[in-house]
Amino acid sequence: FFAAPWSPPAWMKSSEKIIGGTLKKGYEKQLAIYLRKFIEAYERQGIPIYAISTQNEPNFVPDNYPGMQLSAKQQLDLTIATYEEFHNPNKPELYTKIWLNDHNFEDWVNADFILKELKKIGKEYYVSGTAFHNYTNYPASYMSQLYNNHPDHEIIFTEHSEWGISGMYNIQKYFWNWSRSYMYWVTMTTYDL
């Protein structure tokens, strides 16, 4: 299993709601502790979490369901806090991988920025990969651009919906551009199926 939070608790957010807003300044450590507790709770139920992204779709703020915007700098700070919480010497170590971005192809520039900043401070190993969605018309080749800049980091395709047979060609494009996975998002809209 992998996990992607849509929103932290309202008290951590500028909107004071799980819908909208961004992470309050200085709350990165609190959110990292929250993510640790989530992973530990699932593990107690026999469900290990292989990887987690720090935020689902960090560049999109839905107005009618939970979500949160995070700038690339906020994602960087949260990623550092999360890794350091998972590997806190005073707590049991968590081996859950951390994935960046978890958003559309054009957002590869945010992941590139974060990975370059981590490399500058010798912490590029804090992240194992970058997760992508495909809900815009930008090319899957952006995943290859990121891979070419950071070949030691995985590319993971974590979310998309396809209609009809066009989906097969898109899935091929994802793998041609270094994705190690494909996750199909399906929402049931009727009980009549």
Residue spans of the language-model regions?
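Alpha-helix termination/capping residues and helix-transition junctions
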Residues: 44-46, 120-124, 149, 176
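Glycoside hydrolase catalytic-domain groove-lining segments
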Residues: 80, 84-98, 124-170
